[in-house]
Amino acid sequence: MYQNLIISENNPEQVNMLMGEELYLVDETLWFEEIKSEGGNKFRFLNIVDHGNEHIIPESERDFFFRIITSIKNDKFTMDADGFSMINISQYRGVKWKNLDHLFSPVYCIFWGADPEKVGIHCKLWGGALQGNCRILYVDSIKEISENQEKKKQLWGLVKRMFQIQ
């Protein structure tokens, strides 16, 4: 029988009594041999979300996400469902960029509402970063962007630059 013995999760009020007024939570780094993903990753385009939904891409967000993905076309490739990978890091607490790089070897990466700091990447919201040879964007969640016309335009501008689309 599985029993969660972590005091801070079961009895958070007891933590203060045991530890005093200062409490430091340490985010332990974990290595995963496999991470569940959607897509074929042919063009090494990693998409990262962080939500408690059962599906990696919730049904309500699927249509908008695939419209964006299939709009990515340049002289090197035309993006499709086989061209990207999508993961939900909420199920992989403690995962770091080195682990993701090892498993997916991304050349392009978008954090959709998932804080890149969780995996050790420093990037501002609606900004970009370069990690090794991977171009990284950090934007709002798919749901937030799909409901806001200005954010859609802003996203498309960043995606065009990332993939060098004319």
Task: Put a short name on every predicted segment.
Residues M1-Q166:
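A polyanion-binding, active-site-adjacent surface
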